[in-house]
């Protein structure tokens, strides 16, 4: 499948469930093609989980199976190994056996990520930045493709742990679905997308198609003048009044 058709197919596939949010969907797919991670900051019930599940169902592997999807509900009592996995001693073989955690899924939904402690939040840093998971003395690769979609409620102020700058820097975009327009909200009432439309979503793109489209983004020509303008914008955030901490070079 041509790379442009891959992007269009994914956009149309998500639009079949997520109604009236074209800008959100396009930015979602841009992040996917750039191999980035997403932070969704929005109120409950606006479709964050549905969006993540829909995307996972649109892509199949070489055997026709959809991408694996895991949802991690972040709570104050969550532990790092609940995310990464743990080595368990097998009494029969008298050796340690690794039990992988949900971070080894293709699409990982980190739900309400700011409700757990910084120690647990940091369990995501290595895999998001370096594409690897270290448990004990062994380093393992996550699934391919791999993406973290984290959510947080923008109005909560009690019982939360704001994301540290180091972790915020791992997300390519921070998006908000927002409330739908009246017609789109009526469509949600009539169709109940998460229960009626989501099960109907079938794979329309293979992992090979997705990798090809992702590789193509690395070949896009960017004029030196445009790169210079991007660098100037990023650098200006570090001296702008009212900005506590400017953007890192990663933002470019």
Regions found by a protein language model. Give the residues of each.
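Walker A/P-loop
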Residues: 32-75
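P-loop (Walker A) phosphate-binding loop of NTP-binding proteins
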Residues: 43, 83, 151
């Amino acid at each position: 499948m041509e790379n442009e058709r891959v992007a269009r197919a994914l956009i149309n596939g998500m639009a079949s469930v997520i109604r009236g949010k074209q800008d959100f969907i396009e930015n979602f797919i841009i992040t996917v093609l750039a191999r980035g991670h997403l932070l969704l900051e929005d109120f409950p019930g606006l479709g964050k989980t549905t969006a993540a599940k829909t995307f996972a169902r649109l892509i199949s592997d070489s055997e026709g199976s959809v991408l694996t999807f895991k949802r991690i509900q972040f709570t104050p009592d969550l532990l790092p190994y609940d995310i990464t996995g743990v080595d368990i001693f097998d009494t029969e073989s008298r050796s340690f056996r690794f039990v992988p955690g949900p971070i080894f899924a293709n699409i990982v939904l980190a739900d309400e990520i700011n409700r757990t402690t910084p120690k647990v939040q940091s369990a995501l840093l290595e895999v998001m930045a370096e594409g690897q998971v270290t448990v004990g003395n062994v380093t393992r690769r996550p699934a391919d493709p791999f993406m973290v979609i984290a959510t947080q409620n923008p109005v909560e102020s009690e019982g939360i742990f704001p994301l540290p700058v180091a972790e915020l820097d791992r997300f390519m975009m921070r998006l908000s679905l927002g409330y739908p327009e009246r017609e789109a909200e009526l469509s949600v009432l009539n169709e109940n997308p998460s229960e009626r439309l989501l099960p109907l979503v079938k794979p329309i793109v293979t992992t090979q198609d997705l990798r090809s489209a992702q590789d193509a983004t690395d070949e896009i020509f960017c004029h030196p003048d445009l790169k210079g303008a991007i660098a100037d914008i990023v650098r200006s955030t570090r001296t702008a009044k009212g900005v506590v901490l400017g953007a890192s070079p990663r933002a470019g």
